[in-house]
């Protein structure tokens, strides 16, 4: 597993069990990215955007950037 996906797995596990349920996971081949969408019990939506080119994982909640992690 790549370092980027290992970091994503850690982030995903930090949200798991806190009311978030995975809805979809897809690859955006044109932009060299992976996208994981989750939904919370309260209706909030979370999206992980994993950019393979820049090595940045972005976390959006309800369309607003909440956090970014850049691998070194």
Segments (PLM) and residue ranges:
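Short intrinsically disordered terminal tails
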Residues: 1-3, 69-72
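Short, low-complexity interaction segments enriched in Ser/Thr/Pro/Gly
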Residues: 6-7, 61-63, 67-69
């Amino acid at each position: 597993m790549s370092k980027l996906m290992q970091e994503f797995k850690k982030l995903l596990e930090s949200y798991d069990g806190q009311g978030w349920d995975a809805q979809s996971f897809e690859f955006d081949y044109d932009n060299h990215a992976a996208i994981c969408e989750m939904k919370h019990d309260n209706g909030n939506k979370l999206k992980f955007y994993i950019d393979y080119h820049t090595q940045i994982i972005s976390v959006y909640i309800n369309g607003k950037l909440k956090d970014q992690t850049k691998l070194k």
